[in-house]
Amino acid sequence: MNEPLDYLANASDFPDYAAAFGNCTDENIPLKMHYLPVIYGIIFLVGFPGNAVVISTYIFKMRPWKSSTIIMLNLACTDLLYLTSLPFLIHYYASGENWIFGDFMCKFIRFSFHFNLYSSILFLTCFSIFRYCVIIHPMSCFSIHKTRCAVVACAVVWIISLVAVIPMTFLITSTNRTNRSACLDLTSSDELNTIKWYNLILTATTFCLPLVIVTLCYTTIIHTLTHGLQTDSCLKQKARRLTILLLLAFYVCFLPFHILRVIRIESRLLSISCSIENQIHEAYIVSRPLAALNTFGNLLLYVVVSDNFQQAVCSTVRCKVSGNLEQAKKISYSNNP
């Protein structure tokens, strides 16, 4: 009995199923060309100056620094670094997936994109743990208020993110396809078996575990504040806003991306029709900018976390605008004596 050979022979009679063994044509190039550059462009144009203002505000205006201030500053830095990778990806997808920046930059941009994505997730998790300790166990966790604890926690987050994402530099590379140099996404690379297990471990440790921690932290916080007889109404309102922002970030921005990335990789390993595989790929493409949309939510988070942040931002912007006006007046005066 030659059942495997007969199966392959029969499969070859149906182009869709024959293609499912790795020869499916990517029919989603128009979606990548028109959807990804536009969404990434909007995110960059809003997020980059927004996070630059946030960082300037935290460094020059926010005093004294608290543990939450240090975590938020690190979060803003990682969001800014994350956003710097978007112009390269915008150019890549807008040009029909033609990578012109070389193999090193391909690895670096893909690494930077994922490194800062997971740093952002872990900083949000770290912030949630600190909030939980301050509200639920204020006396036993008194030392967590010290900035030294926040500095150590942030250093640990950077190290974990680096260790988690550095294998990606070996799995991602630029390759020549149809006279074009392509910088492949993790799910489109060739080392499928290695990528499958790496992706599962990466997703479990740097997303699923933080998701559970953040959910438990904020459900406990809300339950405690709701049933607390002497809890200040302002504190309750602030906790609710933080809960909504954090859970929206994890369940709306990060969750669809990670679920569809797992499904996308599995679809390349399974014997399914090309039409189904392309539909899965299309859904995965749509989910990718959702992860970047988290940078919008973080801009709101900075305002909710600190009562003085909004005033400090206004002060920073006013100083910048007045400085530019003063410089313009000097230039105008020097040109017209």
From Swiss-Prot:
SUPFAM superfamilies: Family A G protein-coupled receptor-like. Disulfide bonds join 106-183. Changing residue 124 to R: In CAON2; likely pathogenic; loss of alpha-ketoglutarate-dependent G protein-coupled receptor activity at pH 5 but not at PH 7 when expressed in a heterologous system. It holds the Pfam family 7tm_1. It comes from Homo sapiens (Human). Changing residue 93 to H: In CAON2; uncertain significance; loss of alpha-ketoglutarate-dependent G protein-coupled receptor activity at pH 5 and pH 7 when expressed in a heterologous system. This is 2-oxoglutarate receptor 1. InterPro entries: GPCR_Rhodpsn, GPCR_Rhodpsn_7TM.
